[in-house]
From Swiss-Prot:
Stretches that traverse the bilayer: none
Taxonomic superkingdom: Eukaryota
Pfam families: DUF4551 (PF15087)
Organism: Mus musculus (Mouse)
Protein name according to UniProt: Uncharacterized protein C12orf56 homolog
Basic and acidic residues compositional bias, start-end: 131-142
Compositionally biased intervals (Polar residues): 60-74, 92-103
Region described as Disordered: spans on this chain: 60-103, 121-155
InterPro entries: DUF4551
Amino acid sequence: MGSESLETLQVILSGGEFMLHTSVWLVPGSLLSSHPVFTFKVKQENNGPTFWRRKVSRTLNESSLRSQQESSTPFKDPTSHPSDLKELSPAGQGTSRPLPTLSSCQSMAATDMPVCSLSLASSTNEPQELPDPRDAPREGSFRLDGNQSEFGLGNSLPASPLHSCRNLEKEESELHLYIISATSSIFLHLKSSWNNYIIRATLLQDPLCASEHNDVIGKPKPYRSEEKIKHFCQLKSELFLKDNTLRKILCLITELRVAAQRNFILKRLFWKTSELFYFLVNKLHEYLPESRDKHALQNKSQRADELMACIEIIQTLGLMFRETEIESSRLNTLAAKKGTLFNLLVILISKPKVPKSCSKSDAQPVADPTSAEVFFDSQLQKLTLEYTDTATALLYEILLIFQQGNLGLGSTKFAISWMMSFLQSCPPIMAFVARIVEGVVRGLSASFQLLTPCQAVLLYQQFYILRSCLQHSKALAEYIRNDHREEFRYFIHMPALEQRLPGCYPITEPTTQLCHEVLQLIEQKQCAKC
């Protein structure tokens, strides 16, 4: 299809919201019989747009006919460019970018081509400004059903009777997107952007994260671009000093992470100056899985400081990976020295080595529970668990890169399979997968307290990694089925998930879908053995 036959779709994520520009692909009718179809739907009331969700089911012939009719008549885009939103806002209100919710969809009956619908709207009951995540809509799903390309993201809550009645008064407009290839970059970016939005919207339900986010968007930015660049260069030069202490490095990395949270430009600079990425990975290698300083193998206080610094480094790397899919410099940095990326993978799956516990001894009774030794033993245990959770989050981000096939390793399937093949060749991977399963069990068992937003996101990431292992690695799949059969039988099941995962979290539905897929992958193999 020539470039003159389509208009580009740009879907980007900025500040936790989507900005949707001119959004239609004009596809020749001859191509409609073999390609996925997406339907972006917009509903609008007389007093302005509002959130909604609705299932869409339409045959292929109807969609093709409608496309031909639309192509023969002038098309009127029902959505407005962000610059035109002011005209839609009531008097006295500012402008805003509409925040989308994605409605559920059904596969077309005629073929296996997926059809998806997006509802795009914003509330008009309050001034048009960036919405409080706690007031954001709690419903919406984004689902693609097709061969090897099925995913479900989003969350939905039962609509109230009043909400259902109001839906009857809304006008409906449709905007069709015909996806030529499910592995196209725009399609992968669309999925990735929605996934980023789901995670961010869930995390912002945590009061602490929400307050930090409101502080960032509610205050004028204190620096101009030149000053941000100068700040970044200063941090980088100070980090590269040879006489830095561990505490100094920790402070500088924390400052870098906080600055990157406030200004996206620092993420861009981080990937453009690849030396800093290599520096942080090499710094991790100094302390993990064991410290190069042999004194730290006996000094628990020093080892605790090292683990705290490593956790901060991994959190900073995770922040730099998050929401930077469209940065070409990131791909260039990762592809330039693949060895550094694979060294990072080995570090993430390796359990940190800590000094042996001195609380018990064959020749001595239990140590005084108030002693420093017992305190540091407990501290090291907590830091080890925190390290595993932080490493899981970063491994998830790297897994997304290979899932999208963005490293030039061939097709998407080959890329993720190549990564899983590398991981299963690493001796620490079995123990890491065991820690992942233990983390899921820990999250779904014990008390019946609801998971926090951060715990819910971590659970989603854990299930995503387990599903990837089951789908793309025979060795890891067999290990999970054989060595963790009891965990999936008694602790990891849908009722336990429903009890612990609040329905108001946007990430609840995709996590439930992931859990269901993981259980299905395990049960299918067990049935095959029977």
